[in-house]
Structure formats: structure tokens, C-alpha cells
Amino acid sequence: MRKWILTWILPSLLYRSCFHIICLVGTISLACNDMTPEQMATNVNCSSPERHTRSYDYMEGGDIRVRRLFCRTQWYLRIDKRGKVKGTQEMKNNYNIMEIRTVAVGIVAIKGVESEYYLAMNKEGKLYAKKECNEDCNFKELILENHYNTYASAKWTHSGGEMFVALNQKGVPVRGKKTKKEQKTAHFLPMAIT
């Protein structure tokens, strides 16, 4: 008779102890849940911007990146001291260094660091430069699957379609009316300054 009682009590004790351990672990995890997701990510060290080469944090606003915009047609976007927008193949040209400032989620303003002119697009889709930033200077930045970025006017469209910043095979700006997201003339790679 005693054998039967011991074998009956033993599983009961095991289940109770497992239940208490589960409750204890659950309480500890709830106590640690006071941290924000950013704090938890920092503790785990898997979501810091240093670890990701293509961080999307800049799309949230206020961030400034200094880059050279290299078009898939092998030209760097350039804004010279007179405000002329065109392409250059000289990598070490100071007029192709751009300041990309986030003004809203997914919206950026592009400014030539040396020339201090902002890139702008008018309603006909012509690229030009302005000393003062306004709505013509706002572009929707989109990261494509091929890792290139496109910059479409945030203000202007043509027949319901977006108008993109683009450089042709000769480094000449293409009017936004003639551009599409899929064209390589509108694909830019933001390159870090070395």
C-alpha cells in the first residue's frame, strides 16, 4: 500500500514544482518588461545602427547624412558653385558631396555641401538648384530591392506618375516627365565619404 502512495505523491510533487518554476520565471520576465524595445535591443546588442549597414532610422526625421549620390549610369550627381545641376565622373570632386536631410518620414532635402544649393524640381520635371529650401526641394526617398535609391519629387507629378531625379548616360539631368522608377537613370547609390 505504501508503494502506491509514494508513486502517486511523487508525480504530484513534480508537477507542483514545475508549476512554481514556471510562475517564478513568468514573474521575472514581467518585471523585466518595463524596458522599452529600444532598451531591450541595446541590451541584446542586435539592433544598434552600427551593426546594420542600411539602417532605416534616418527616415524618421531630423537625420543628416553626407553622401555622394552615384547614379547607375556611372555619374555622380553634382551641384556646382553657380547652381548648375549635372553629373561628374570625378569621385574626388567637392561639388558632388551632398547633405541628405530628412524632413519627414521618407522625405528628404538634398543640398550640395560645397555649393550650398538645394536640389529642386519644378512642375515640368526640370532639375535646378535653389539657395533657399522650399517644397520644390523635397523628394521621396525609396530604397529599391537592388539596393539603389530613387528620389521622386514630393510635390510634383506628371499624369499621375512620379517624377524622379535622373542622370542619362552623358551625365545630363533627365526631365522628371520622362523618368520611371525602373529606369537605371533614376537609380542612385548613396556612397559614404572616404
From Swiss-Prot:
Segments forming a coiled coil: none
InterPro entries on file: Fibroblast_GF_fam (IPR002209), IL1/FGF (IPR008996)
Keywords attached to this entry: Glycoprotein, Growth factor, Heparin-binding, Mitogen, Secreted, Signal
Main location: secreted
Location(s) in or outside the cell: Secreted
Any single Pfam family the record assigns to this protein: FGF
SMART domains: FGF
GO terms for cellular component: extracellular region
Origin: domain of life: Eukaryota
GO BP annotation list: positive regulation of cell division
Signal peptide coordinates: 1-31
PROSITE patterns: HBGF_FGF
Glycosylation (residues): 45
GO function term, MF aspect, one: heparin binding
Family according to the record: Belongs to the heparin-binding growth factors family.
Subunit: Interacts with FGFBP1. Interacts with FGFR2. Affinity between fibroblast growth factors (FGFs) and their receptors is increased by heparan sulfate glycosaminoglycans that function as coreceptors.
Task performed by this protein: Plays an important role in the regulation of embryonic development, cell proliferation and cell differentiation. Required for normal branching morphogenesis. Growth factor active on keratinocytes. Possible major paracrine effector of normal epithelial cell proliferation.
Name used for this protein in its record: Fibroblast growth factor 7
Originating species: Cervus elaphus
